[in-house]
């Protein structure tokens, strides 16, 4: 398939400590890159010596991490306030969506984590406005930090059912059913696909 005709997948990835989310996103991107043009939008700290295949485009947002003992978000660039950092990130997102016709958006871990809810919802809503035919996919690992069926879990289901087309769960349901860690699983009304575990 000629690269000009390839559909374009944008993958939003954010990690605040550890790089598991990024590794999973990168491996999925590799598996898709033969048939799609894949762009990774990375909001975590840049990873030194990480080899990105030339067929995958990596866009580095101004990085944000957080202290392990709190939910305080901190820009990697100490000269930026957190608000300024988010504003710069938003400008980059807008620029990408205005320049590139995105066919599929994949969000890593969202909406099962809400630290970057405003940013991801902004991305989703703007993309829906620009391209109503865009498809939306949530990519999530086998276990999540659920709130035992609380209002937070209800909001996760509401966002999935309102904005998304597919939930990809990266596990084997015979080994680790998703409802083990997410009690509201039956409230998810969109298509669900167990992909098996993602490995390097």
For the regions a protein language model found, what residue spans apply to each?
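Conserved nucleotide-sugar phosphate-binding/catalytic loop shared by glycosyltransferases and other
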Residues: 5-11, 31, 35-84, 90
